[in-house]
Amino acid sequence: MVRRKAKKESFFVPILFGLLIVIGFGFTYKHFENKIEVNQRTGCPISNVDQRSALSLLLDSSEPYTPVQMSNIVNRIQNKVNSLKSYDRLRIYTIGVAEEELLVPHFDFCKPDPESAESPLMRNWKAGNFEQRLRDTLGLMQGSRDNSHIITSIGSVASELPDSYDERTIIIVSDLVENSNIGSMYSPNWQEALSDRNSLLDARRPMLGGIRIEILFAPRANAGIDFRRVRDWWRTFLSDSGGMVANIDPISG
């Protein structure tokens, strides 16, 4: 009896070993099939085939926001970032001079994949690093500048969003008061002045090419400015520049 049992066990050992090999091969194949090669600095896919959606934030730091405005803006942005999928690209810029050189993003990372083939420790570190850098960068909104080159800044940001992305969105956080060599909306006759400088305005016009535009419109306490007129001008200007203006949401407080 003992001898027959040994023969029976020896018969099933190769079968069990073969099943383990098949299962192991399946896990290995799935691992490499789902693995996306990424840039080690940004965490973004190297191959254009793996490029997903791209979201760029353009923050106006020309004047401080109120605490209520700041809280509302950060919450809105955080909700938008939370809705991004793995490997979607997020860039954050502040409005600046972009006539000779492109703006450099303060934040340029892709959202980490919580189900990547990396170790759990590495996945958790990347997720935490992404969130911490995001919080630190949003603090750059609180600043003070004499000028506000919004038009050329939008053009710079748009130039970094090629149509190889499935979806492209720019969120502008600003009071939308242009104050540059193109024109100053602090002037009571700013609209007429911009019309007189139409050739310069066209030369600086951003090429939006179907990019989705969302605006968190945060007027500051600037006496003598008709913000409704400012808002309406921007809606027309961005649409004429090829942008898909989805919404202009007021941020009060």
Regions found by a protein language model. Name each.
Residues 221, 225-253:
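Von Willebrand factor A/integrin I-like adhesion domains
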Residues 72-79, 155, 193-201:
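N-terminal post-signal-peptidase region of extra-cytosolic proteins
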